[in-house]
Amino acid sequence: MTELDFIAALRALATQPAARGLADDAAVIEFGTETLILTKDMMVEGVHWLPQQSLADVAWKLVAVNLSDLAAKGAAPVGVLVSHMLGDADEGFVAGLREVLETYATPLLG
């Protein structure tokens, strides 16, 4: 299956209006007069960051790319949810995460 075939298969599953045909990586959910925008980007070692990179920088980039998606939609962040798989190298990641969250005044929600 090619990447385009894979995306087409996902689009067939994403029938909820908030998915907007998977036009981008943000979902837009309407609650009466309020709008909630959700986004989630994943980063893969060797693709989005190199093994020798500082994990503090990796954490920074992970949050920043998601905050950028929200900004592109004109949304202000309520907070971020983070997941990662880094083995035993958590300290640097936590330091970078703390820094980027403080810089953008965005709370960690989970």
Model-found features: residue ranges?
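Small-aliphatic-rich amphipathic alpha-helix that forms the alpha element of a beta-alpha
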Residues: 56-79, 95-103
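Extreme N-terminal cap/leader segments of soluble proteins
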Residues: 1-54, 73, 82, 88, ...
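Short glycine/threonine-rich loop-to-helix capping motif typified by GTGT followed
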Residues: 87-95
